C-alpha cells in the first residue's frame, strides 16, 4: 500500500516525498528520496569523509554531517555503531518495542534537519515517530490506519499496542483508514472525533507489461489453490489448512499453496503434517516482486480466509492476473 501511495504521489509533479525507512536494502526504486534511519546519527562521531562514502548506502557524507549537526540530546548511553547510528533488525524482531522507540528518537533528528509540510505515519509501528516529528516541527500529522490491534489480535487487544495506537490517533490532525469498517473501529474503539477520520480505500497499481506477460502454466490434471500473505492470526491460515483437509477427503487432484511468512508458519506446517496432507501442500516462503504474480498466475483459485480484513489488496492483485478470488 505504501508503495502505491508514494508512487502515485511521485507522478503528481508538484510534490516531493521523503520516505523514512529503518533499513534500506539498496534495491529500492529511486522515484523518491529515501532516508535510511539506520544511517542517521544520534551520537556525535568524528568520521572521515572517505570512510563515510564507503559505509553509507542511501546517503551522502554531506547529508550525514548535516544530520549530525541536528542531534538534539545526549544519546551516548544508547547502543550505536561506529557512525553513531542505531542498527535495525528489520521485520518483527523480539525487541520490536525497543526498535519502535529508537525509530522515534531518530525521527527527532530528521524532523529538525529536513524541510517538509506534512507528516504521514503508517500504522502503530511509526505512530510514535510521527508524534515526535510533529512536536519538533509543528507540522500537521496524518496517520494511516491499515489495521488496528482489534483486527490483528482477533479482539484480544494488547494494551501496550492499543496505547500506542490511541496516542498516535489523539495527536493526529487527520486519520486515514483503509475502509469504512476500520473508520468505525477507530471512532468507536479509540474514541476519535469522526470529523477527522476518513475512509481512504486501498487500490492496486496497474500491472507493467512484464507482469502481464507472465505465462499461465497449464496443469490440466490438478488444480492449484493458493493462500498468499502474512501467516498470522489475523489472516486465518488455520482455516485454509482445515478447509484443504476437508476438500482432500473428496478429491486428491488439488494442490494447496501457502505462500508467505509469519509467526504461525511453523504451526501451520505442523498442522498440515497432523492432517496427513503434506503431499498435497506447499510452503514456498515469502514472495516478493515478480514472484507474487507468478504465484497468482500459477493458481486456479486464490483464497483469503482472514478473520478480520480492513481492506485486503491481495484479492485485487489476483484478479489483475485473471485468477478468481
Which residue stretches match the model-derived regions?
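Carbohydrate-associated surface elements
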Residues: 181, 203
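Nucleotide-sugar donor phosphate/pyrophosphate-binding loop at the beta->alpha transition
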Residues: 99-106, 139-142, 150-167, 206
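A conserved catalytic-core segment of Leloir-type glycosyltransferases
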Residues: 12, 18-111
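Conserved donor-binding/catalytic core segment of Leloir-type glycosyltransferases
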Residues: 176, 218-244
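Short glycine/serine-rich donor-binding loops of glycosyltransferases
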Residues: 312-315
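Nucleotide-activated donor-binding/catalytic signature segment of Leloir-type glycosyltransferases, i.e.
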Residues: 267-287
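Short alpha-helical donor nucleotide-sugar binding micro-motif in glycosyltransferases
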Residues: 286-287, 294-299
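Aromatic "clamp/platform" in nucleotide-sugar-dependent glycosyltransferases that forms part
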Residues: 307
